Regions:
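Short, glycine/charged-enriched secondary-structure capping and boundary segments
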Residues: 20-23, 45, 65-67
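Local sequence-structure signature of Cys/Sec-based thiol-disulfide redox active-site neighborhoods
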Residues: 1-26
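Intrinsic disorder/low-complexity segments
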Residues: 11, 48, 62-64
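Long, low-complexity, intrinsically disordered polar/charged segments
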Residues: 17, 29-30, 74
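Thiol-based oxidoreductase modules, predominantly thioredoxin-like and allied folds used
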Residues: 6-9, 25-39, 44-47
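Short alpha-helical
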Residues: 14-15, 35, 67
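Non-catalytic, surface beta->alpha helical segment in thiol-disulfide oxidoreductase systems
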Residues: 52-77
Length: 77
């Protein structure tokens, strides 16, 4: 079965070093098989691409490699 991830954009506040608003975006569900961090990174404007892991934890995903992403997914099974 193809693994899919929910994508978000998040505004990052450098002052308090926290992510604030979370919005599902145009990559709402992205297949791990078609993961393209460069495309995701280049399409962000001021918001950061984030991914929600099966555990519910959200992480920055822009520079994440496909291999690292698969490791994280397997870790949370």
């Amino acid at each position: 079965m193809e693994k899919k991830l929910k994508m978000y954009t998040a505004s990052f506040c450098p002052k308090c070093r926290q992510f604030h608003a979370w919005f599902p975006n145009e990559f709402e569900y992205v297949s791990v098989d078609n993961w393209d961090s460069e495309k995701i990174e280049s399409e962000r404007i001021t918001a950061l691409p984030m991914v929600e892991l099966p555990s519910g934890k959200k992480m920055y995903a822009g520079a994440m490699s496909k291999k690292r992403l698969e490791e994280l997914l397997n870790e949370y099974r």
